[in-house]
């Protein structure tokens, strides 16, 4: 992690609250709420894989979070099984959440919630409020909620954890009692794993690369004029109002560069921005390893400036064979 010589930046990055579930049990004062009527469907603390269920027979390994081991896991797919249609006819969803005890954020002018999670969801008969919702409250009654499904398509099997960073200052800044809630809502299956929940104060200048938006990891159809796109986010406490570049280094030797003209259109705090690279020919190989990198001199944290991705074609066209 890159740290500047500025004392205020150094102190601003320190975590002031964290839970990694290494004790192997629900922390004192936390609660688990199951709103189903027909069967128990509760969050659990576990270090075990998702055991598999209808239409997803294989196990999903435990989340490969930074701390590894114990994590929070919700597995509605095991409960609904092959009975999703019947659950839908009853207009009942396997909804459930876990909630922290009160967290002291007094004296914190900016608060960022960070956590790692892994999930797979089924879009059969989803409800109007369907989503993976993270709620923040300073009274335990009124909640500001964020849907953290990150536009991941239904049935996508993620392998690497998704790193979430949400600026929750609107609710949490300078509050003595702050509660966090992780709520699976109006989806019948399959699972959600959460680990390494943390509250920090943000850097002033901090851009983060989040994910590739132009391609999935597998099943791609590469073209001669392919446009790679990647999403970044301003997770700092200040707007970004200077131009910077983002590079994409491919394992075939290509290096693409895109310029973000933030001087004309500043990127506000918590704003996301999609970077598009110049079109390139990706038909020559069936898979690619790509390293994306932000080049922004003011950035005070380098650990989130790099994103490594693997892209695989659905099939590879070998062209016309002239000899065998």
Enumerate the language-model features and the residues they cover:
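Short coil-to-beta strand junction motifs in C2/discoidin
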Residues: 125-133, 242-244
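Extracellular beta-strand-rich recognition modules
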Residues: 21, 98-101, 105-122, 132, ...
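Extracellular/luminal regions of secreted and cell-surface proteins that mediate adhesion/ECM remodeling
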Residues: 145-161, 190-323
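Short, surface-exposed loop/turn segments at beta-strand-coil junctions that are enriched for proline
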Residues: 106, 169-173, 280-285
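Bacterial Sec-dependent N-terminal signal peptides
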Residues: 1-16, 201
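Extracellular glycan-recognition surfaces and repeat-rich motifs
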Residues: 14-83, 323
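Conserved Ser/Thr-centered positions that define the repeating blades of beta-propeller domains
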Residues: 100, 135-137, 249
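Short beta-strands within extracellular/lumenal beta-sheet-rich domains
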Residues: 85-108, 162-165
């Amino acid at each position: 992690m890159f740290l500047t010589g500025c004392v205020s930046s150094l102190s601003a990055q320190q975590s002031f609250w964290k839970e990694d579930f290494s004790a192997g049990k629900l922390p004192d004062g936390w609660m688990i709420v199951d709103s189903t009527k027909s069967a128990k469907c509760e969050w659990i603390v576990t270090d075990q894989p998702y055991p598999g269920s209808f239409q997803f027979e294989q196990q999903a390994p435990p989340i490969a979070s930074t701390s590894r081991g114990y994590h929070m896991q919700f597995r509605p797919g095991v409960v609904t099984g092959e009975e999703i249609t019947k659950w839908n006819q009853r207009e009942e969803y396997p909804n459930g959440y876990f909630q922290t005890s009160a967290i002291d954020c007094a004296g914190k002018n900016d608060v960022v919630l960070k956590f790692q999670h892994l999930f797979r969801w089924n879009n059969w008969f989803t409800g109007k409020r369907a989503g993976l919702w993270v709620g923040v409250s300073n009274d335990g009654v009124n909640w500001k909620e964020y849907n953290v499904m990150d536009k991941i398509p239904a049935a996508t099997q993620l392998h690497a954890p998704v790193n979430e960073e949400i600026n929750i200052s609107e609710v949490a800044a300078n509050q003595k009692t702050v509660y966090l809630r992780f709520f699976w809502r109006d989806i019948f299956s399959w699972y959600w794993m959460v680990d390494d929940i943390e509250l920090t104060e943000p850097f002033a200048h901090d851009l983060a690369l989040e994910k590739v938006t132009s391609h999935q990891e597998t099943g791609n159809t590469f073209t001669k004029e392919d446009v790679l796109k990647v999403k970044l986010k301003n997770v700092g406490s200040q707007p970004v109002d200077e131009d910077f570049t983002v590079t994409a280094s491919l394992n075939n030797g290509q290096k693409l560069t895109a310029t973000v003209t933030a001087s004309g259109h500043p990127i506000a705090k918590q704003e996301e921005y999609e970077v598009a690279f110049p079109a390139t020919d990706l038909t020559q190989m069936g898979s690619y390893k790509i390293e994306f990198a932000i080049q922004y001199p003011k950035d005070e944290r380098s650990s989130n400036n790099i994103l490594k991705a693997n892209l695989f074609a659905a099939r590879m066209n070998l062209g016309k064979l002239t000899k065998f």
